[in-house]
């Protein structure tokens, strides 16, 4: 889920709704007792553990940060410090599109999902799933 991955990519503490780890669609009341239906959907525990590991990356705590909205409801965000950067691409409506990134061409592990990300000719192919990868920072 792109919004959840984007929340984990932000600086500061990540806040989840009660039941979000079980794909609950019911929004709980903030002021009344409202039990979570723990059988409401698929378990997202592994995804949240992977995002939690990503959240502990030093660049998320110590780096500078920039986010921008692209066409097609895609958010692109970058944390950087020194010669390294962490780039995130989040398609909040599942849009598929090529996205220009300031990263050297190559293959990188997707820290927000499974598999690898390929940067080719300065672009990544957004398939609608969240992308987060670490690369050398390009000189400007």
Residue ranges and their predicted role:
Residues 27-30, 34-72:
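Aromatic- and carboxylate-lined catalytic core of secreted/periplasmic carbohydrate-active enzymes
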Residues 118-140:
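C-terminal beta-strand-rich structural cap/linker in extracellular carbohydrate-active enzymes
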Residues 14, 21-25, 73, 92-95, ...:
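Short, solvent-exposed loop/turn segments at secondary-structure junctions
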Residues 1-42:
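Aromatic/acidic polysaccharide-binding cleft in carbohydrate-active enzymes
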Residues 1-8, 49-52, 75:
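Generic hydrophobic alpha-helical scaffold/packing signal
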Residues 7, 19, 51, 87, ...:
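Conserved, mostly hydrophobic/aromatic
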Residues 102-114:
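Solvent-exposed beta-hairpin/edge-strand motifs
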Residues 68-104:
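Carbohydrate-binding surface patches
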